[in-house]
């Protein structure tokens, strides 16, 4: 994948490409536990069972199958993601109904990124929340 992006073949798609193969395990999957243990959370900053109110704008880099988002405008490097930044993989959502059972935390440094942003772990993935009319994608 990295070679495809660097050769220009993946540019323009919403594909997320890992910045460095050292972030992968033996099966070539991202080794989240090694590089971003504790769900990428800073210990002591975790607030469970929180609610994101209607009207809030959240965003994420990645597919609709993910459950992690941030408040809109958290800088990319503060998200501590293992990917090359791809603006085509950026999605922004408006919360239409309050979302309960959210875990909010500060993002720990990971994948050689500084962290320090805020992350929301949602109770369901983006696809499900869209289907249930909790969120809608916005530009």
Whereabouts are the PLM-identified features?
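Catalytic toxin/effector domains delivered as secreted proteins or via bacterial secretion systems
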Residues: 2-139
């Amino acid at each position: 994948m990295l070679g495809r992006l660097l050769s220009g073949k993946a540019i323009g798609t919403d594909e997320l490409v890992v910045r460095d193969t050292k972030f992968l395990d033996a099966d070539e999957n991202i080794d989240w536990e090694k590089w971003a243990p504790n769900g990428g959370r800073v210990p002591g900053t975790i607030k469970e069972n929180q609610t994101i109110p209607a009207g809030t704008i959240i965003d994420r880099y990645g597919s609709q199958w993910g459950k992690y988002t941030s408040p809109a405008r958290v800088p990319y490097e503060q998200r501590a993601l293992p990917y090359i930044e791809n603006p085509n993989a950026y999605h922004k959502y408006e919360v239409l109904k309050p979302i309960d059972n959210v875990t909010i935390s500060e993002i720990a440094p990971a994948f050689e990124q500084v962290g320090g942003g805020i992350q929301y772990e949602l109770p369901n993935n983006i696809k499900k929340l869209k289907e249930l009319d909790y969120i809608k994608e916005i530009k």
